[in-house]
């Protein structure tokens, strides 16, 4: 049996402002920093000591991991970073206000773009101020892998190779693994772990800053579907807040 802990980054500045973020590298808000500290405290109180962290290339996830580890007294453990754990790329919606987008395009189109499994938003122009095409952190990424927009199915496809090639080997070695990532990269992983169908995944929301713990069997399937949040009541309240974004 092995232990996998999933932690969505704390509230970002753009989360607080109600903007679509995607691959834009915004920082944590003060509330998000406190959520990251809470995540670290919850890990310490539960006696969970990760041996290794996997995170994205975006500072809101990296800083969440760093703050949580500092709070738990585990700032020294190794951290591995990959673009495959980045947030879903929201295409031309990046930088746009969610409520205004909903008002402009209507509830149905808004929810299709936000929660449909296989329908991406319009692509982002390469000359957009929110484009990552000249970002040095992606300099070694083959151009054909650099997204201009993504649906959740795209995130699943890019995330799964990392699950098999990087995370599972750590779990197989007996390490407790913390994945500090994003709402949609974690939804993609939970979809795989819990074998959630393409339609039902639309109803899954991941709260910020509350560790979700999976105890895994020897074949890396969950012993309990859905795992367990270390603060179930706070998670329930935060999930409702995520669900209501853009209203």
Curated annotation (Swiss-Prot):
Domain of life per record: Bacteria
Coiled coil segments of this chain: none
Pathway as given in its UniProt record: Carbohydrate degradation; glycolysis; pyruvate from D-glyceraldehyde 3-phosphate: step 3/5
GO biological process terms, semicolon-separated: gluconeogenesis; glycolytic process
Location of the active site: 9, 87
E.C. no: 5.4.2.11
First-level EC class: isomerase
PROSITE patterns reported in the protein's UniProt record: PG_MUTASE (PS00175)
Keywords, comma-separated and alphabetical: Gluconeogenesis, Glycolysis, Isomerase
Entry-linked SUPFAM superfamilies: Phosphoglycerate mutase-like (SSF53254)
Site note Transition state stabilizer, residues: 182
Catalytic activity field: (2R)-2-phosphoglycerate = (2R)-3-phosphoglycerate
Gene Ontology MF annotations: phosphoglycerate mutase activity
Binding site for substrate: 8-15, 21-22, 60, 87-90, 98, 114-115, 183-184
Record's keyword annotation contains Lyase: no
One Pfam family linked to the record: His_Phos_1
InterPro entries from the UniProt entry: His_Pase_superF_clade-1, His_PPase_superfam, PG/BPGM_mutase_AS, Phosphogly_mut1
Summary of the function given for this chain in its UniProt record: Catalyzes the interconversion of 2-phosphoglycerate and 3-phosphoglycerate.
Family listed: Belongs to the phosphoglycerate mutase family. BPG-dependent PGAM subfamily.
Designated name of the protein: 2,3-bisphosphoglycerate-dependent phosphoglycerate mutase
Lineage of origin: Bacteria, Bacillati, Actinomycetota, Actinomycetes, Streptosporangiales
């Amino acid at each position: 049996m092995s232990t996998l802990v999933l932690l969505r980054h704390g509230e970002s500045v753009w989360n607080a402002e109600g903007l679509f973020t995607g691959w834009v590298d915004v920082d944590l808000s003060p509330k998000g920093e406190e959520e990251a500290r809470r995540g670290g405290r919850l890990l310490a109180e539960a006696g969970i000591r990760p041996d290794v962290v996997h995170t994205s290339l975006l500072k809101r996830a990296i800083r969440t991991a760093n703050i949580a580890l500092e709070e738990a007294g585990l700032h020294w453990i190794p951290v591995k970073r990959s673009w495959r754990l980045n947030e879903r790329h929201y295409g031309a919606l990046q930088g746009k206000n969610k409520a205004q987008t909903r008002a402009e395009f209507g509830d149905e189109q808004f929810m299709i773009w936000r929660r449909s499994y296989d329908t991406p938003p319009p692509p982002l122009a390469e000359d957009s101020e929110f484009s990552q095409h000249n970002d040095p952190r992606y300099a070694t990424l083959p151009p054909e892998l650099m997204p201009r927009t993504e649906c959740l199915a795209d995130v699943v496809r890019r995330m799964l190779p990392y699950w098999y090639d990087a995370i599972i080997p750590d779990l197989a070695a007996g390490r407790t693994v913390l994945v500090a990532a994003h709402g949609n990269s974690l939804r993609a992983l939970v979809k795989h772990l819990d074998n959630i169908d393409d339609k039902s995944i639309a109803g899954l929301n991941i709260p910020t800053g509350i560790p979700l713990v999976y105890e895994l069997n020897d074949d890396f399937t969950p012993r309990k579907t859905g795992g367990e949040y270390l603060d179930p009541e706070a998670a329930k309240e935060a999930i409702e807040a995520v669900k209501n974004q853009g209203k």
